[in-house]
From Swiss-Prot:
Subcellular locations according to the entry: Cell membrane
Lipidation (S-farnesyl cysteine): 1090
Region of interest (Calmodulin-binding), residue spans: 7-29, 768-795, 920-951
Gene name of the encoded protein: PHKB
SUPFAM superfamilies tied to this protein: Six-hairpin glycosidases (SSF48208)
The name this protein goes by in its record: Phosphorylase b kinase regulatory subunit beta
Site note Not methylated, residues: 1090
Amino acid sequence: MAGATGLMAEVSWKVLERRARTKRSGSVYEPLKSINLPRPDNETLWDKLDYYYKIVKSTLLLYQSPTTGLFPTKTCGGDQTAKIHDSLYCAAGAWALALAYRRIDDDKGRTHELEHSAIKCMRGILYCYMRQADKVQQFKQDPRPTTCLHSLFNVHTGDELLSYEEYGHLQINAVSLYLLYLVEMISSGLQIIYNTDEVSFIQNLVFCVERVYRVPDFGVWERGSKYNNGSTELHSSSVGLAKAALEAINGFNLFGNQGCSWSVIFVDLDAHNRNRQTLCSLLPRESRSHNTDAALLPCISYPAFALDDDVLYNQTLDKVIRKLKGKYGFKRFLRDGYRTSLEDPKRRYYKPAEIKLFDGIECEFPIFFLYMMIDGVFRGNPKQVKEYQDLLTPVLHQTTEGYPVVPKYYYVPADFVEYEKRNPGSQKRFPSNCGRDGKLFLWGQALYIIAKLLADELISPKDIDPVQRYVPLQNQRNVSMRYSNQGPLENDLVVHVALVAESQRLQVFLNTYGIQTQTPQQVEPIQIWPQQELVKAYFHLGINEKLGLSGRPDRPIGCLGTSKIYRILGKTVVCYPIIFDLSDFYMSQDVLLLIDDIKNALQFIKQYWKMHGRPLFLVLIREDNIRGSRFNPMLDMLAALKNGMIGGVKVHVDRLQTLISGAVVEQLDFLRISDTEELPEFKSFEELEPPKHSKVKRQSSTSNAPELEQQPEVSVTEWRNKPTHEILQKLNDCSCLASQTILLGILLKREGPNFITQEGTVSDHIERLYRRAGSKKLWLAVRYGAAFTQKFSSSIAPHITTFLVHGKQVTLGAFGHEEEVISNPLSPRVIKNIIYYKCNTHDEREAVIQQELVIHIGWIISNNPELFSGMLKIRIGWIIHAMEYELQIRSGDKPAKDLYQLSPSEVKQLLLDILQPQQNGRCWLNKRQIDGSLNRTPTGFYDRVWQILERTPNGIIVAGKHLPQQPTLSDMTMYEMNFSLLVEDMLGNIDQPKYRQIVVELLMVVSIVLERNPELEFQDKVDLDKLVKEAFHEFQKDESRLKEIEKQDDMTSFYNTPPLGKRGTCSYLTKVVMNLLLEGEVKPSNEDSCLVS
């Protein structure tokens, strides 16, 4: 009987295979038979190259458009579509063979033909792009999916195809790949860029790519998120390619050996560093929804070699191989429905939970075997090359002429799907050699040529990678690049520091304490500029009126950019960092914060400086910095600089003229001025001219005003409803700056900014009080003034991007009120609107204190990311609540300090205190309150919630928020970032921090109970609130019995109970969880030792 069943199965399989083959009738190629037979040992170099030339001619160049030079995506008749990405690899394939032909003296014109096929394609793409120069200009200012360059063009005319609504054109990886191959090909001697219009256009492409770290796109697979619902994501593969392109093109001359100073491309060093940080924080993930992805292979290996860290490279590669490798190729990503038998070809997007259908039957792509072969060649690993060559051979096919063909993918036919799902890997797959995909997959064909040329040693890695994107570890020290793609070597970087005093009298005063400084006049002819003037200079970079392109967008220059020396219009210029700018936002008035910022900036430079030559850090000392009690901390910092070590960073202080010789010099030659053009005006930092016979006085002010001077005489609630004339009278009578500001704020809301008081308009009056309060360090009045005039720090948007770069979400809004979740970078204007809209209805001062915290957290998360471990969502309002709670704990029986009266540096220290791992001395109530406010979770928490959900058919509910089992488990995977965010969203409805922490503990208890009792599962919806209530009820019973006290509804004693121990919270939580589980059915298990029969 078994034999008959096996025979029937075999016959059935043959029938199904024949049916699948019938569907593929009309194929021009069949499985490979003779193409890989060993060729004669005495084959000449000409014979070897001639063989590959014929392959390239018949499987690549045959399809190249004679007009634009682009390559079609599908080679079946009549298809007019060309994808930038595919065409680039086709050009690279022709170029690779041209490099091999350079080794033959008499090549019969083939080198020229192949090189110019590549050039024609590269210029064809440039032609398509330049016709969309208006989109480059829009995207540069406002990067959105509806302002980007197109990724699809007509193969023969170069016209754009499909609107933004019909196709996801935002694929930054394609633009980055173009820039990368442009540099590689020009470095090999090809001439691709012809004139200054093209140079300025490429420079503008660089401006677009620089900010990839903050632009979610549709990725290599053109689908955005894994759910294929039209949403974009930040992809590691896109960021990695952008990083590689920026490293390759920085300081590169687009005219090659014939170039001059104005054909050089400039890259913002700080933007490049942001991309690097983003890539390292995203990996080994591809994005929030893609836990891993085969698109990472060309990112971490050929052609980008984007990773600095060998450990991260191995971790990422291992994950890709482990999760995606198959017999026929690599899956693109898990649950990828592309071209599977169950995908509906008529629908562009998937329905919710539809991706579960594709689990286990994803198509496998042989092209990734080729990437692994190339990676093996570059890394000198012949074993890897052979392994993937052996895997590739059985899946190759051949044309009727006998040339090898790489199928685009292998799929499971519809008749085999159920068998494959039941037994993964058991069914035969069939290649995509007909139908919608055309006859040849040109991207695969091109990569096959590159891989085989490298494997057969007809070209070397140095030939195809002339800019040395890949540098072996042992050779890293010998590579002279603008900044290498390789990570920092273990060196002891010394930062050069120049001390500049703003006036001569300040210099004399500091000299009496042994601090040697220079004034702006003493460093002449070197000019000192604020970074904003450098931004003005860079605005002239890439301007092209004919194409309608402006220069570099108005983006600040960061610490790395200001650590270089610039040659501008014959002048030598140094810039002081942005932290020394006199900002309109009040934080710049706190000297202790400035000292902290200087230490952070030096640590940042030490960690991320990658250029040859030492960084030059200019410390600008102002007279206001040393007044009163601010003098001692400032003097301590200057003494530490003089001694050569500050904050763990080695520094060398010297005269600016001496330090220039060891610095990096950037020539800004794009500022070419003709006789007819007017010279741009730049304002250098000018020396302060003090009044005659004046001296610097240390005693002129104090660091913080006395508490009594800070305390207002009036309250908003008391005076809000009083008539205007009474408010004006009180305004004239009181001398307290905080009280005056509060009264003016009431008038501002009621009468408007132009209402006249005795000292002018309300808005002008508030502005003057704001300045006076700042000089006196009356922080309460300062914050009121800043809030009423809606001050906004220019560094908020970059700091929020820093949160996102580190894989965190951020919420803005007051504790206990509606919050706005930010999961993608936003413009400063949008963030300002959110802050003032969400916070002003609660307390005017909240809007400015939230800005302070965003700035503080941005610095802390950059330098000490471990303080935010376990915190996926940073809720600013809740953190403020935690800080106020901490002040209450510290005050004991006395009235707590007002958070708004603390200086910004004291606020930062308080923030650092609550972020530190909780000290043992704290009671459990305080621990839970702080951890709950910080939204901190234990290690592996979200994975445990996933495991709970797997055994909870009706889902989990807490605070009225339901997390259903389906479609959650169908749409997502266990280690997916989006699932973790979904859990956070569920917990976000809880309004009490300590209660939230008890719920987190409860979920950990549920997970452990289920783990130890595999036969149990929940039959009904798990109501966490109900379980906590029952656990508290059990706790009350024990408390009243043991302590002989009446039951109390107040849960304080429960919150203050340790989790572990005989009567710990976990024992009560475990009891109610077990009760709920035992109410349901017990699933029998064969391994259960308790079974009696």
